[in-house]
Amino acid sequence: VFLTAVLDALDGMVARIREISSRRGDLIDHTLDRVADIIIMGGIALGSLVDITVGFAAIIGILMLSYMGTQAQAVGAGREYAGLLGRADRLVVLVLVPTIQHFGYQDWNQYFSEGYLDWNYMTLMCYAFAIVCTLSAFYRFNKIWTELG
């Protein structure tokens, strides 16, 4: 995940500096970003720490947020980055939370009677991605809708 974040930050910058940026490069960049999102979050969703339903809800939220950004560009409103938990933010969270989960695991069940909730840091991250990314996608949609008049 860390390597993905570093490479994602560098690829566009290198293309601009070398003056070789192109629409095809932008297409490849966005496509590979979504593939990376699906692989990373799919691994988390299919892992043992997160309920698969919550994991896939996070994937849907992430993909909808990214889609709204690129769809704005497609309809002529310009690329839209508004809202919380954009790609850079998510990559930071995806580096920090698994690290905290690994080194600072806390049994959340001790705070809930009868242990009905089997929560951990990864589960909380996926809930946050599902909810915040979906709300940010709606925010982007509304902003784009307003701009299009």
How would you name each of these model-derived features?
Residues 1-13:
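Alpha-helical membrane segments and adjacent membrane-interface helices in multi-pass membrane proteins
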Residues 1-4, 22, 26, 55, ...:
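A generic hydrophobic-helix recognition signal that picks specific residues
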Residues 3-6, 28-32, 60, 88:
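Hydrophobic residues within alpha-helical transmembrane segments
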Residues 4, 15, 32-40:
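Charged, low-complexity, helix/coiled-coil-prone segments
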Residues 6, 23, 27, 34-37, ...:
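Residue-level recognition of specific faces of alpha-helices
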Residues 11, 15, 19-33, 79-85:
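Juxtamembrane helix-capping/reentrant segments at transmembrane boundaries
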Residues 34-149:
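A feature for the membrane-embedded catalytic helix bundles of lipid/isoprenoid biosynthetic enzymes
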